[in-house]
Structures are given as C-alpha cells and as structure tokens.
Amino acid sequence: MRKYLQLVFLAVSVFCSEILFAESRDPVRILDLRTLNELDLKEQEKAEQLWDIMHTTATLQGIVNRNSPRLYIRYVKNGQGENVDDYWWNKYRQAGQWLAGRDTIAYTELSDVVTVFRKEIRGVVVYDSKVASTSNIASSVAGIENLIAVRYDISPNSLYTRLVLQGPKLAVKCWLVNKDGSSLFTGKGRIAGTGQPSTGSLKIDPYVWFIEKYLKKGLCNTEYAAYYIDQFWRTDPTRTVTNHHQLTNHDFFVSKKAFFFDLSPWGDEPATDDPTQEEGLDLQILKTFLQEAYKQNKGEKFCYIGGFPSWIYKYTQHAGGKHEDVATEWEFSRIISAYNAFKDADAIGLGALANSSFWQHFPLQEKYPQKWVTHQELMDRGYLNRDGTINFQGRNFILFYVGDYDSSSWIAQTTPFLWDEPSRGEVPLMWSVSPVLAERVPMVMHNYRVTATPNDYFAAADNGAGYLMPGMLQEPRSVSGLKSGLSAWAKHCSKYYQKWGLTITGFVIDGEAPGLDSDGLDCYASFSPNGIVPQKMPLTLLHNDMPVIRADYDIVDHDYRRATDVIVERVEKRPVPFHWFRAILKSPSWYKGICDELKQRHTNIELLDAPTFFELYRIYLKQHPDAAAGKITMN
C-alpha cells in the first residue's frame, strides 16, 4: 500500500511539474493599447472605438486568464503620466522575479489576439448601443458563458463588423439586441425571454432579464460582483480622466463569473440616468441582486464588490440628483453592508485597473508577519517608566492614518509616486491598506512588504478586509431584515489579518450606519485586538483589552506647514495625550515635512509608530478608568 501511495504521489508530482513547465513555456501575449490614450474622445467615433476595444479585450482577458496568466495589456496611465501596466510588468520581469525568463509575443491589434485564443471562447455576446445597461449585462454573460462582449454596430470599421460579420465571423451565442439592431428591451409589455412584465424602464428591464435567466438559476458566482459605469460613459467621456470607463477593471470579475451592475443606492428619487423610472426602482433591483447573492452565499461568505459610485456621472448633485458625493458613497456602503457585501473602492481619479485577471495568479508568501512592541522595548526607548507608567515628559503623541488604500486601483496607480518616493522610511508611518486587495493586486501587496523599511508599519484600512459599514451587520438589520453578520465578518477578516500580520484597523467609517455596539466591538476585538478607530464612539474606550480611539480630523492641506497649524491647534484642544489624524494620498515627504516643522516650532508633539502608539494608549486607558470607560469628553 505504501509503495502504491508513493507511486501515486510521484505521478501527481510529475503531472504538476509538467503543468508548471507547460505554463512557463506558454508565452504571455502582450497587447499594446497605449495609442488609445491619444484618441480625441470628443469625437463620437473615437469614443466608440476606445469603448469597443477595451470592453472586448477585458472580457477576453477574463476568460483566457481565468486559470493561468496568459494575456497582458499595456494601457493604464496614472495621474503622473506613467504607464502603470509597464511599471508592474517591469518590476516582476527582473532577474529572480515571477516573470523573469517568460517568453512573450507582442501584438497591437485586438483581432489578432482574438484569433490566437479563438478556441478558448465559445463566441460572442452582442449588446445594444441604445440601452446603456446592456453593456454590464454583456460582461456578466461573458464570464458565465465564456463569450466576448461586442457592441452592435454595423459601420465598416466597427469591432462587430470585423469580428462577427467579417474576419473570424465569430458565432453570436447571446443577443441583447435584436439581430436587425432594433432594441430587444423596450421598457414596454413583457421582458423578452422571461414572461416578466416590463418595469417601464429601459435601464432596468435588462437587469430583470439577467436575474431571471442567470442569477436565480445559480449560474453566476455570487461571491463576486462589479459596480462599474455602463455605456452612459460614452455620453461624456472627457468629464473626468479618460480611463474612467473602467472597462479595464472588468477582466478580473469576468474571470470570476461575477455579476455586473450600475445602479443608484437612493430610494427617494429616480436614478439620474433614468429620470422617468419609478422612484427608487434602481435601489429595488440593487436589493434584489444583493438578497439573491446573500441567499446563494448562505450568509456565510461575503460578496466582494469591485467599484464605487461614478459620482461625477450619476446619482449625485453633479448629475442633477439631490445628494452629495460622500453621502452617495456612504449610502451605497450602508445598503450593501446590510446584505453581507463589501466594496473594493475603485473611485474616480485613480479608478482604472488593468490585468487583475493576470496578476491574480501571482504567488504570495504563506504569511507576512509583523512584530508588536514589548513593554521592555518601551522602557528601553524611554516611553515607559520602570513602574509601568507612561513617561510623557509633557509630550502629546500623534498617529497618522496613511490612506486611503481601500482600493486595488488606487494602490496599483500610486505606488510609483507615493510608495517609491525616496523619503519613505525617514519617519514612522502607519500604512493603512485593506488586505482584501490581495485578491486583485497581490503583486502590489507583496511589493509593499518586501520593500518596507523599519518605519513602515501596516494596519487595515477602512473597515477591515473590505469597505463596509459594520454597524449594518448588527441586529436589528432594518434594511434587509437578515440575521447578524458579525460572526461571518469576523471569520472573513481573520483569514486576511492572519496572513498579513494585521492587528490594527486604522479607521472604521460608520457614515450613516449605527455605531458599533458591544457585539460589534467583540467582533473587531476577535481579529483586531490591538486597536480600532471608529467614528461613532466615545473619545476614548477600552473594550476588554482592545484600545478604541475615536476618529478625529482629516488633514487635507497639501502644504505641510498649514497642515501642521491644524494639528497643533487640534492637539491643544483635545483633553487626552493621544491623537489620530487621517490623510489621503499624501507623500512620505509631506509627513516628514510635518515632523520637521513640529520640531522647529519646539512643540511637545511627537509622531509615533503604530505599535508604540496603540500599546502606550492601551496602558494609558488601563491606568485612567474614566478614559477606559468612555467618560472623557471634549470641552
């Protein structure tokens, strides 16, 4: 029997080795789409060209990269003008890195790449130019059915003409438009292929079709969803950065067979992109998606939603709605949290992310541990007296929440000009990064850890392993009526915190959700025992042994001198010697400038590393019962 098992093991080992060897021999196809960045998108034809190429490419990538990394594109530029796709490719192309020695074949024409992978795809899903939401339905169907998405357009140079009517003449397996180009979804009568009455909305009927034909039948993977703008983008492609069509972001979610949507979270007005619809219809369908995902995930697994409200285009005052940008962000978070879903927040400005279906195969280490400070070390460094009391010497201690790194696209785009800045490491910084981003950009997360200095420490970003509002996990859950999601959240977060050596949650956005109650605090204490920073809490609190400090000011000024003014003024007003400040996308040199300025002004304010800050704060709470009990208030 032992000999038999040895032979089986040997055969399996040889088989696995052959697979790995075959993968290493299989060249990576690299499609260069950089010229699309130069198109004049004020011309309708150019905007359509960009949209069509990026959409078909992303759905193709999602299919062919599902099981191994085979197709890479060059396209996304960050705000500094640097090509992000080239940056990451070149980093891991170096000797000894993951892509070193891998053969490549370069392409400039999408049709050539489609020909290469023709046997990998079953055909095409064709969608309707006149019904914007069908583009998102096409991405959903593409992943489930192994189809590439192509917009119906019979003009001579369109992709539809070049791939379906001519060229390879790919078979159309799913029509989201009639074959003559007239709309399949009309907002009248019954919804095609379902027997369901029309909602009266051109936008919503395709979503109902998808829910009936695919979602309710269990055909898509409800652990993943994608919240990206639909074809409405083509109405004004230059309203913000031109890569905010975010079609590049589709590939990962296509590979996961996710469902795609672009819906308003507001129930008190029609969606701004569909003003004649019944008030709150978008929200109704959003809840249907989330409820069905919760049901299929059995309330045990969370739904990972990539994306963010496209607030400059839809659902806010920018688009003629009632609500402000942040309010819309928070309302979307509040709603999805009620159904055990969180978002990976690809927000406008830095929201484009390519090649995640490729990078998802990047090999991570088993664990990335971080060391916590000991009391002996605090004594040796002069922060703790021998009797266990804190050696303040008149000092106030501050900590920066270095954010916002709750988005895969944001950390991929900002690494070249923020993380790589030469001054990083000169002052202690608490880099607050959501560990769930390792799903889409593991190469970024790995790079952070292997290039970190002793002054770089990592905490989880808002609000743990994903951006949701944890108060909406607590019972009673008025939006959804579901049972508590706290135990599922603790289980979900624990896996990521353990892998990445995290014990601090650097910020908890409560927004318009309830604050954490005792059960919510117990939940966080189970995976974030060394500290949390919520919004709706007393100024100070010790929950069992977990230190809790209420979130305070955002420091937004780009001038570090004026930023220092705000910090000094705030520290003088606060009644406790521990202070948390949040900053968004600030450079290491900005933080160093503040520290230098504090010293030059001879203030008593000192920036600490995260373990020292939270451990001293815990000691302080234990030695000050009123502070531990949450009885300290602002004057």
Give the ranges of each region predicted by the language model.
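Positively charged n-region of N-terminal signal peptides that target proteins for export
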Residues: 1-4
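Bacterial N-terminal signal peptides
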Residues: 7-18
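Preference for solvent-exposed, low-hydrophobicity sequence contexts
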Residues: 23-366
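Short loop/turn segments at strand-loop or loop-helix junctions that form parts
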Residues: 127-130, 306-310, 396, 400-405, ...
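Catalytic grooves of carbohydrate-active enzymes
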Residues: 282-310, 398, 403-412, 416, ...
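A recurrent domain-boundary module in secreted/ectodomain proteins
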Residues: 348-376, 613-635
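Active-site beta->alpha N-cap acidic-glycine motif
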Residues: 356-449
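Substrate-binding cleft of extracellular glycoside hydrolase catalytic domains
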Residues: 434-495, 499-500
